A protein has these predicted regions:
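C-terminal motif of bacterial Sec signal peptides marking the signal peptidase cleavage site
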Residues: 5-8
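Sec-dependent signal peptide recognition
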Residues: 1-2
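N-terminal mature-domain "stem" immediately C-terminal to a signal peptide or N-terminal signal-anchor/transmembrane
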Residues: 10-81
């Protein structure tokens, strides 16, 4: 279970996924936004993505493309280049098809968040998102958003996994572990926040 933890002080998306503890959690579909851009790249879409995901784009660049591009000068060309590979684009489409509807996960996470707020005063889940990493990091953690890489949860028998992952690794790469891994990432980030320097 791999986590990239990038603690940031400002907002990573423009809007909160929810305003109250009892409101339904909505998973932010960063994966769909990036796919939409890749299908028809434009400077307008680049500006929209930078405005909507100011810090998350940088974290995603470090995870998916192993870049430290803080000014975005190479981010979008690198992104287009990475996903120009037919196999990676097929994996991207497979993930989008598998997670076209994420309401079952949102319902489970909403129930978990209700439990958290009732039993742990002042605690709640942050914003939650999905991205595609190209089989890199499972999870990106910022101080107010946790995102999982949907392409790492396509089922233990997913054909493309067999070339890259051992059977014991593939057992964890199933849709039934999506909610578990969101919650695990949140718990680990809370431990980091609470631990003394």
């Amino acid at each position: 279970f791999m986590i990239v933890s990038l603690i940031a002080c400002s907002s990573t998306t423009k809007k909160d996924a929810y305003n109250t503890e009892t409101e339904k959690i909505t998973i932010i579909r960063f994966d769909k936004d990036i796919y939409n851009y890749l299908q028809n790249p434009s400077e307008v879409k680049e500006s929209e993505l930078k405005e909507k995901y100011p810090l998350f784009l940088q974290a995603y660049g470090r995870v998916a493309m192993i870049t430290d591009d803080n000014d975005f000068s190479g981010f979008f060309p690198d992104l287009r280049d990475k996903f120009s590979h037919p196999l990676l684009m097929q994996i991207y489409r497979d993930a989008l098809n598998t997670y076209e509807d994420v309401s079952v996960y949102e319902n489970e996470l909403t129930a978990a968040n209700t439990f958290i707020s009732e039993h742990f005063a002042g605690r709640k889940l942050p914003q939650l998102a999905m991205h595609i990493s190209g089989f890199r990091q499972n999870v990106i953690v910022l101080n107010n958003i946790i995102s999982i890489s949907a392409d790492k949860y396509l089922g233990s028998e997913y054909a493309q996994y067999k070339e890259f992952f051992q059977p014991y690794e593939r057992q964890q790469m199933q849709p039934k572990f999506v909610v578990r891994d969101y919650l695990r990432a949140w718990l680990m980030s809370e431990i980091v926040k609470d631990s003394p320097d």
